[in-house]
Amino acid sequence: MRYEFIVRDPVSDLAAAELPELSSCPFPTGGTSMFGSVQDEADVLTLLARMANLGLVVVEVRRLPD
């Protein structure tokens, strides 16, 4: 499964380095799109918790086509 996480603000290189399983690119509204493969929905929840611990505000989560 592939998921995309839209983060409200730009993500620093330091924060992105803490999430090596995700790629990132600027989002048109000024935030950041982070995306990558996950094993299952528990993995999605773990990523969300890690993002929260890094101070990232996730505003949208969506499953991408495989």
Name these PLM-found stretches:
Residues M1-D66:
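Long, contiguous binding/interaction regions
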